[in-house]
From Swiss-Prot:
One of its GO terms (molecular function) is shikimate 3-dehydrogenase (NADP+) activity. The active site is at E268 (proton acceptor), H283 (proton acceptor), C853 (for epsp synthase activity), H1198 (proton acceptor), K1227 (schiff-base intermediate with substrate). In the N-terminal section; belongs to the sugar phosphate cyclases superfamily. Dehydroquinate synthase family. Residues 405-871 are annotated as: EPSP synthase. This is Pentafunctional AROM polypeptide. Homodimer. It holds the Pfam family SKI. It comes from Saccharomyces cerevisiae (strain RM11-1a). One of its GO terms (cellular component) is cytoplasm. Keywords: Amino-acid biosynthesis, Aromatic amino acid biosynthesis, ATP-binding, Cytoplasm, Kinase, Lyase, Metal-binding, Multifunctional enzyme, NADP, Nucleotide-binding, Oxidoreductase, Transferase, Zinc. NAD(+) binds at residues 43-45, 78-81, 109-111, 114, 134-135, 156, 174-177, 185. Pathway: Metabolic intermediate biosynthesis; chorismate biosynthesis; chorismate from D-erythrose 4-phosphate and phosphoenolpyruvate: step 2/7; Metabolic intermediate biosynthesis; chorismate biosynthesis; chorismate from D-erythrose 4-phosphate and phosphoenolpyruvate: step 3/7; Metabolic intermediate biosynthesis; chorismate biosynthesis; chorismate from D-erythrose 4-phosphate and phosphoenolpyruvate: step 4/7; Metabolic intermediate biosynthesis; chorismate biosynthesis; chorismate from D-erythrose 4-phosphate and phosphoenolpyruvate: step 5/7. Its main location: cytoplasm.
Amino acid sequence: MVQLAKVPILGNDIIHVGYNIHDHLVETIIKHCPSSTYVICNDTNLSKVPYYQQLVLEFKASLPEGSRLLTYVVKPGETSKSRETKAQLEDYLLVEGCTRDTVMVAIGGGVIGDMIGFVASTFMRGVRVVQVPTSLLAMVDSSIGGKTAIDTPLGKNFIGAFWQPKFVLVDIKWLETLAKREFINGMAEVIKTACIWNADEFTRLESNASLFLNVVNGEKNVKVTNQLTNEIDEISNTDIEAMLDHTYKLVLESIKVKAEVVSSDERESSLRNLLNFGHSIGHAYEAILTPQALHGECVSIGMVKEAELSRYFGILSPTQVARLSKILVAYGLPVSPDEKWFKELTLHKKTPLDILLKKMSIDKKNEGSKKKVVILESIGKCYGDSAQFVSDEDLRFILTDETLVYPFKDIPADQQKVVIPPGSKSISNRALILAALGEGQCKIKNLLHSDDTKHMLTAVHELKGATISWEDNGETVVVEGHGGSTLSACADPLYLGNAGTASRFLTSLAALVNSTPSQKYIVLTGNARMQQRPIAPLVDSLRANGTKIEYLNNEGSLPIKVYTDSVFKGGRIELAATVSSQYVSSILMCAPYAEEPVTLALVGGKPISKLYVDMTIKMMEKFGINVETSTTEPYTYYIPKGHYINPSEYVIESDASSATYPLAFAAMTGTTVTVPNIGFESLQGDARFARDVLKPMGCKITQTATSTTVSGPPVGTLKPLKHVDMEPMTDAFLTACVVAAISHDSDPNSANTTTIEGIANQRVKECNRILAMATELAKFGVKTTELPDGIQVHGLNSIKDLKVPSDSSGPVGVCTYDDHRVAMSFSLLAGMVNSQNERDEVANPVRILERHCTGKTWPGWWDVLHSELGAKLDGAEPLECTSKKNSKKSVVIIGMRAAGKTTISKWCASALGYKLVDLDELFEQQHNNQSVKQFVVENGWEKFREEETRIFKEVIQNYGDDGYVFSTGGGIVESAESRKALKDFASSGGYVLHLHRDIEETIVFLQSDPSRPAYVEEIREVWNRREGWYKECSNFSFFAPHCSAEAEFQALRRSFSKYIATITGVREIEIPSGRSAFVCLTFDDLTEQTENLTPICYGCEAVEVRVDHLANYSADFVSKQLSILRKATDSIPIIFTVRTMKQGGNFLDEEFKTLRELYDIALKNGVEFLDLELTLPTDIQYEVINKRGNTKIIGSHHDFQGLYSWDDAEWENRFNQALTLDVDVVKFVGTAVNFEDNLRLEHFRDTHKNKPLIAVNMTSKGSISRVLNNVLTPVTSDLLPNSAAPGQLTVAQINKMYTSMGGIEPKELFVVGKPIGHSRSPILHNTGYEILGLPHKFDKFETGSAQLVKEKLLDGNKNFGGAAVTIPLKLDIMQYMDELTDAAKVIGAVNTVIPLGNKKFKGDNTDWLGIRNALINNGVPEYVGHTAGLVIGAGGTSRAALYALHSLGCKKIFIINRTTSKLKPLIESLPSEFNIIGIESTKSIEEIKEHVGVAVSCVPADKPLDDELLSKLERFLVKGAHAAFVPTLLEAAYKPSVTPVMTISQDKYQWHVVPGSQMLVHQGVAQFEKWTGFKGPFKAIFDAVTKE
């Protein structure tokens, strides 16, 4: 057990730290703070903790006579830290008669400590407070120092006071119930204090990280009985005693630091702001990422960024930055906002650069507009004794991954610099392998601290190859080797990023690893690029030698599984070494541990990079094993059995490849650079770069055994190198390329060409480096020629010819391909652009992308370039890649034959305005119009699949971002390569849509289709094989049932068009802002309910599918239900709900696998809303949230048992949880036990307005809550078999109740005009009012005087609710309107008067909506961009028709009329963008090339058509034959029901015709919604209007 420790602060020993010190805590408070009243304050979460209950009971039992104990409980979470909660607590204290001697005891985390401390500071002008922190963060930070505060709506901690507590009593035992993430969160502050003040404690923390993470990862949930209430509570539990000593020390040491700093600077005037290390940048991230990210997580990121800033200034060494980053990762904290797990946790929120800087400007350390940041000098010490001023330019650089390199203008020609590159990556990795296999201790100095070596160190540790520790403040790594005997298989895959060296070396090492009782293999894996890089020759050799290895993904690349129960036999091993020398080194280093001595023969030609093999052999010699080179057989080596003996010290030589960059800088800028620790004795081939490349190009070279100095010639005078074989130094060829780019000579025939050969292996490095250099040099205006094993660079005639990379849209970035050497090379060339311009001439910088990739070998390269070599750098918000700037991600449609791909692909292209390509047709074009069937007969299926894959990859590469619809062959998923391409496209944001239908229907169709090659096997077998592939490759899915009638076909088209618009974001899913409802379906199968679905949804903005009620949960069945619902309801938004049993539904609580599958079906089907229960496991919640796409998430919680009153903390906790998940709507359903529960609910609703909230009570007692709920109230229908929850009402019932309460005022509405005796408006609107239970009345007001309408209705009727205006008043009424909509202005008439209140009125025109919606409802797409429109007639309605066709996207609108002279003034009065073309002669129609697919007839219906007009009309009707959809004509007149225009269009030219009655009802329904806020029940209204 640990001892009680007391820590002084401000001269008093008031901080007590111990474990299980409840008795000491009570005794200390009562003895040293005597009082008549003690008030314990905590939140409801803590009330569930047994240790808290024990403390309260003990406190009560120990009270002296005359004293009392009060307890006050607040809701958990930051929302309680408010003025309101403070006032409530103060009122409680006053009511309880508390006086000046009161002692407040704050037991809790930072929220409780801050708020109770502030109450204590102001109550009775200040009473005593004792802090009892229960979270790690509160223990080491917020409870110490006397800072107290509450939040305001404008920011956190804006109102507060310094008020020192009488005691801070820290009991480690509280941490037993701290949630894992909160525990880790607190570690950020612990690491911070060690980092700024206590290097020894930092080292101790490093060595105990794995213990800590093992313990907190073992957190469990346990059920406990509450000693105060006897209720059963569930709390988390961590075995603190398993790491008690470590936890106690980390808390104590962190507290000591803060106490010492506070004692020196209580009011935060200077020294105390050192405690803000990591907070300047961390707080900026927190401001954006809250509440998803916790304070400590953001501070962790801030610490790394601020440490990088210090390194950038040349103050902090790269080693120290690496240590800080490593320890934060080791304790489970994020070090970058871009980490995958952290991005998912923070729901992929963006952190824009300008917002971060703006947030940083609001920092108490700042002085005015100048920002200040704490700068670290080394681990355990800050630079200076307070924060330092930093510029926005430097901050921008640190905060982004894109850097702007300005011209190297201000660098003096006589500049001389000494640069020491980091340790060699090649030597570092070899040294780690050799020391791990060796026996004894080896101190490795100048080890490269990079991503590569970090992965290697982690792997050695995980495989238990050696014990690793650090000395010299982390500069020296101490490897205690165990001679290979302890190597053991680990369960987790070893992730190696893009570390090629580590992957090759560890593959052979894996052959020496021993199995454990539970683990018989290890897995090596890496990032996406690593999984493309070759490793096959090495694997082939090891397999041939007895090691069992499997590829887990791509043949020939990681990931691989190495079985540890196979053996590394030894003997003769043959290896192909023409691709990578690392294969050779890998086997060489492990060979002494084989069962027999090894003879390693390199076969297949001259080995690549032989100097690296020599390096390995020399290093093995240092570790005690001598390799003998054969004298009789070329490239063959003998390695004896044995084991390495570790030298006591091994110093890593600086990386010679990295040294080429500062040396090339000298060459290019005409300055001098010395690298003091690489000379001609170096083990590394790249050490000869200065001598063999730069010297012949015109540089002065001085090279000793251990140093190299380069002095460049005057800028612009470098000479090209006619030929250089860079095989001994292949990695340096990139540096040579950028030097060659600005090299030229006086020979006009040389073309300034530098020829580099011997570098074929560079095509399979981090990227294809030869291609990368050629591609990026071209952006600077430099031409290249690719050679079989090299490259020619054709230098520019003048350095002034270098261009800033750009395209037609402006500057573009230099891509680095996640390759450190590409990035560092181009950082040099970037600075030479415009470097010779006049000094005061403004020069654009060059943008380098993904600068962090240099971390692989030289994390501090940019710092050296900036701080030591004098380059001006800046950071910038990432440019959207030019290819993505106007990106319209293409749609790929996959599915079985006969699924409807051809038809639906056409619909898709039409709906989105995309181009359509059928890949089978493209195949035939590329194969001389040979059909697929013929090709298969002649060449076989395998060859066809290869060609199909090639074509698919090509079109995606070239047109994936350009707005295409690609219709594929049914078997595209048969090829593994095609499947990968499909998945890659989907993961890059593309749409891969699986189209499917009932397999039985498909079989029937396919058996009768002779046009395609026959299936070799049964159709059902094909489907069974492909079904999983279709699902795996697609990110969206649409069920397209077979249609037997044209009406069904058109309904399916409308349904699909809305679906595709929704998933692509063209159609935005809106959360209703006003009163709205959704109906809850409770059918087990919708197939037989299609007729009822429309009336069931009357008055609703959405419909809920209770999936847990469905007959089965198969993907096909559920998708079919969604399809039926969409078709039947004209795609009313769907709420997809799977209600679990514990939340009142039918779905089994623990069936998480099926639940995941159902959510996947929902998201692929593009449902508008998905109900996500807040009680589900966190991983499921985050999975759904991060995959939601355009679907809105409803976070729901139901209390069916009535366990929680609305003022219970359960609801507050759940609301905070919903905020953290960033759901779109919160849905809470309680149970009303009595009427007062409704009042409590309304108070909750009133205080929770920062998210749309659905909050209702169940049971009949809760009906009133449903009436008062505003957004998406759940309702039932009389046509449903039963309601989904007790107490549900219909829309009509709710509206009637709301009216009776005064919520809806009865309105009187009228149709006005003359004559109106036959007007159908009253029956239209009154039908809707009756169905929806609205109290309004619609009547006729017949008059030809607009003045009378104003006097009697607008001014004279206090209940006036609106007017439908007809002839002759549509123009006259406009003078009395206070506002006009755009439609009313353009159409030039008002048919709808909308009251705005205060005797103000808005004039609108819904005729165009009547036309538009009638057309869409009859199969016309919502966007018809590739089709022209036609209007017949030039009267008043024609203006509305033209407006409607323009809104549909018609690229041209033709208009014909009996009197052609009326056309010109009509066209001139309308906007030019309508692109209206008046047709005066029949002949001109023949010249029109456009397809005409949509028309509106606005001519009188009761007279025959004029012959000339009829002739023009018929010529246009012919043009409908090739429209992308069924050509459709709307008749604007609703009497008679069939007009002459309708007859000729339908009977003679097969146009689909829409009667005027539909326009009438659609425009009326549009009015209905504008007046009432409710969607009119269209079908019922239409039937009522047309029944006579």
